[in-house]
Amino acid sequence: MKKILALLVIAPLLVSCSGNKNQVENEVFVKDTNGFEILMGQFAHNIENIWGLKEVLIAGPKDYVKYTDQYQTRSHINFDAGTITIETIATTNPAAHLRQAIITTLLMGDDPGSIDLYSDVNDIQISKEPFLYGQVLDNNGEPIRWEWRAAHFADYLLQNKMQTRTSGLHVISFVTIQLVPNHLDKRAHKYLPLVRKSAARYGVEESLILAIMQTESSFNPYAVSRSDALGLMQVVQHTAGKDVFKLKGKSGQPSRSYLFDPENNIDAGTAYLSILQNTYLGGIQNATSRRYAVITSYNGGAGSVLRVFHSDKNKAVGIINTMSPGDVFQTLTTKHPSGESRRYLVKVNSAQKNYRRY
């Protein structure tokens, strides 16, 4: 019971990080990134106390994780791997716990503001247009929109696919559901109208926006990170968010609930790309070289990109303008001080090629 109480104390402070629009008062506390990281560490520690060593799962950029039943049951969607795992450590009638979690996960909507990822409250609203509609097929090969179909599929899974595994002192009951092979493409198409709207507004390539979204979140609207980046394009409130609000003539920075709205998030992420493209890196003459710099800057900042070439920003731009795009790419992917940023350029550039066909 003490383990549950510890989570009940921490969870309300993390509520605003999940985008819950009813908990705006908590945002002041978690605006400090260090405070957020401390709370996340405490949350992880308490999950470990309940589930055991090596069993900590927390929502991330490409992972939706929701706990229910006093943190004894959880739903995990791995958007990269294309799998849904519903599991429970409940010892009394585990199938019943799994059944409810399967149904609500299959039928949840795509509004992150309606779900608190850090509490154990089953606050998932069944949607008439489920977020996973078309991404999961039942045992008859049919997409799942209605509660009766989700319930039938849950019963089928529990009768035919339920498994158990042992972890520490727990026997964990679970089922695994595969997303359809083209699940990534289906999510991309879902947000295409919003992408096109923002691309036209800010003069940014649609394919670049989609590639950034894939790399940042795998089109997961519930995306969160320990670095305090939020939503589909993983916008950070106090850096990119501030720049975007300044561009719009607004003071301050966007709230978490604002950035968890898919339309706002895509708008903000695209606006920031336009700031990088037209302001911070606007002096780079070759469009391809500038695109490489913009992509890397979206991950690690424009200053760190320019310092790869020279400590003086103006001289750095001048040096870039004497180089071929291939040499710029080679330099950024081998000499940027951040390994993450080096890999990021490779990933986004590769993904963008696939989205040029849209």
UniProtKB/Swiss-Prot annotation:
Gene3D superfamilies: 1.10.530.10. One of its GO terms (molecular function) is peptidoglycan lytic transglycosylase activity. One of its GO terms (cellular component) is cell outer membrane. It holds the Pfam family Mltc_N. The keyword Membrane applies. It comes from the Bacteria. Residues 1-16 form the signal peptide. Murein-degrading enzyme. May play a role in recycling of muropeptides during cell elongation and/or cell division. This is Membrane-bound lytic murein transglycosylase C. It comes from Yersinia pestis.
